[in-house]
Amino acid sequence: MPIDDRRYTHRRLPMKIDEALKVGQFMHRVTRDPSDPQGTWSAALMGIKFRRDLVDDYVRECFGSTVQAGPFRGMRYGFRAAGSMYSPKILGSYEQELHPYLRSLPAYRRFVNVGCGEGYYAVGARLAAPGIEVQAFDIDPEARRLCRDLAAANGVDDGLRIGERCSPRTLEALAEPGTLVMIDIEGAEVELLGGLEAGRVADCDFLVETHNTPELGLTLRAVVGALSGSHAVTVVDQQPRDWSAIPELLPLGHLDRFLAQWEGRGPEPWVFAKSRRRAG
């Protein structure tokens, strides 16, 4: 049997000399006082970030800025992410447990994205369902700017509106039948959902990421409680990633393959809530 071993040939990750020097200097300071737990932890995080940045550069060299797989395949993506990881989005494995729900976007008339970041989902929704109306929100002005830029780069800025803060009353006004609401706001989902009048959002569907916060703990129970009266609720757990499906990752070692698809998540599931009234 002929063997092609070229796909396993190791390619050096792009090296960032200046950043490598910074990491080395920091590590040197830490080793002089290894009893400092905070310093040791900071050094470990810096090392992980440094290696992840190298993997991001490798992924850019392989694929440029085009999303390779998933429901948003073909999307022109920016060269950095806001509040999330870069490489998983380019590879198309980002939050892949949501893909079955995102592939149903053409069935909706409106997509509301609360906590849109740089616009991966807001812009992706317009590409996956060209006729859909998209309303995005983010309290970070830099994220809103990146979202506008990403929409323009993909030619979908005409059907996408971007706002700053989404209050319960704002969301109720948008929650018409045929609307999918996606919420990822780092724990503030409890306040937003808790302020809704259930009858005014009973005709739309929800995708909500839960979070572990120092004040509330895991918000899963609160999210389910807020939606279960009017919606059929499904807890969407994280799924393992399969790097073997991406030939370009084969030359990398296990750690780098892992980092290419690593999203930096804790045990924080999503919740999908399907309108009971619309289903009936």
Enumerate the language-model features and the residues they cover.
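Conserved Class I S-adenosyl-L-methionine
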Residues: 224-236
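Generic detector of well-ordered alpha-helical packing
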Residues: 96, 114, 139, 185-187, ...
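A short acidic, amphipathic alpha-helical/loop segment
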Residues: 101, 124, 128, 170-174, ...
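Short, hinge-like loop/turn segments at secondary-structure boundaries
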Residues: 130, 152-155, 178-181, 199, ...
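Residue-level marker for buried hydrophobic side chains located in beta-strands
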Residues: 110, 135, 181-183, 206
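S-adenosyl-L-methionine
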Residues: 2-135, 137-188, ...
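A short alpha/beta connector and helix-capping loop motif
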Residues: 179-180, 191-224
